[in-house]
Amino acid sequence: MYRKIRPALIFHYFIKPNIYGSIAASVLKIPSIAVVAGLGYSFSKNNWLQYCVLKLYRLSLRSNYKVWFQNSEDAEYFLREKIVSKEQLTIIPGDGICTNTFKPVYNKMTVAKPFTFIMAVRLLKSKGINYYVKAAKMLQEKGYEVECQLIGPFDINHPDSISMNQLQEWQNNDPIHYCGFTENIKAYLASCDCLVLPTYYPEGTPRSLMEACSMGLPVIATDIKGCRDIIQDGFNGYLCTPKDGLELFHKMEKMLLLQPSERMAMGTNGRNKMIEEYDIKKLLIIYQSAIDSFINESQVEKIQTA
C-alpha cells in the first residue's frame, strides 16, 4: 500500500503499526512518526515477549522522523534503552480531550445516596478490577451505602481478559454493578461521584482519567506512569499503590467522607488541568507544527540537492 500511495509522511499508532509500519516506511524511504500510546500488555511482565518487542522497537524506530510518547516515563525508558534519540522524541498530551464536549454537570454534586463510584475499562485483570471489587466489598461491610459501577467491553481474545463466569460471580456476591459497554460514557460520568482506576497495566495516558477530569470529577488512580501525569494526590484526586485493595479501600472511603464542596474543588482542579494541558486543541497544534516542520525541512533539502 505504501509503495502504491507513496505518502509524504506517515503517522503510525500502537505497537504493531509502529513496528511493522515503520519498517515498511523505512524500506521505501518514506518518513514516518510513531505514536507510542503506552507500552501495553507485552511490557507488563519481564519475559521473552518484552525482550522481543524491545528488539523490534529498536530495529524499527531508529530511522523514524519522530517518535511521540504519551507520558514522560515511557520516553525516558526508550532513551535509556537507546531505542530513540533525543532529537526524535516528543511528549504529547495523550490523545487529547475535547473539554467542550466533556463538561461538568455541577447540579449532581450535592449529597446523594448512594455515593457512586465508577470504573470504566477494558475487562482485563491488569486494569485492577479485582482490587476494585475487594475495596467495594470492604466499603459494604463497613456499612457505607455505595454503588460501585463497572463499565467496559470484554476482550475475550486477550490473554489477560477476565472471564464472564468471574464477572457473574462478582455481581452475585459483591456490590458490583456491571453496566456493560456503552458508547455514551458521558451519561454515566454525569451521574457518578468519583472515577476509580486501580490499573497496573502499562498505560500511556488513560482516556478515562481525562474524560472524568474534564467533566469535573475527582479521581482515584494508581501511582503508576501515565496516571500520575494526570492525577496529583490531594489536588484533583488520590493516588494509591498498585495491587493493594486495602489502600484502595481507604482512598475510596476518604473520598466519600469528603464534603461535597471538597470533592467539587478537586473536580475543578482536574478540569482546569485538562483545559491547560490536555485539550485536544493543544494536540492538534503539535500535529500541525510537526507537519509544517517536515514540509520546511523537505523544501530545504530539495534546495540543497538541486
Regions found by a protein language model. Name each.
Residues 152, 161-181:
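Nucleotide-activated donor-binding/catalytic signature segment of Leloir-type glycosyltransferases, i.e.
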Residues 12-18, 36:
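Short His-centered aromatic/hydrophobic patch
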Residues 120, 147-162:
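Glycosyltransferase donor-sugar binding loop
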Residues 247, 254, 261-277, 283-289:
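A short, well-ordered alpha-helix in the C-terminal region of glycosyltransferases
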Residues 58-104:
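Donor nucleotide-sugar binding/catalytic pocket of nucleotide-sugar-dependent glycosyltransferases
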Residues 232-234, 238-245, 254-260:
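Conserved acidic donor-binding segment of nucleotide-sugar-dependent glycosyltransferases
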Residues 218-221, 231:
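Short hydrophobic beta-strand element within catalytic cores of glycosyltransferases
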Residues 108-127, 133-136, 149-151:
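Conserved donor-binding/catalytic core segment of Leloir-type glycosyltransferases
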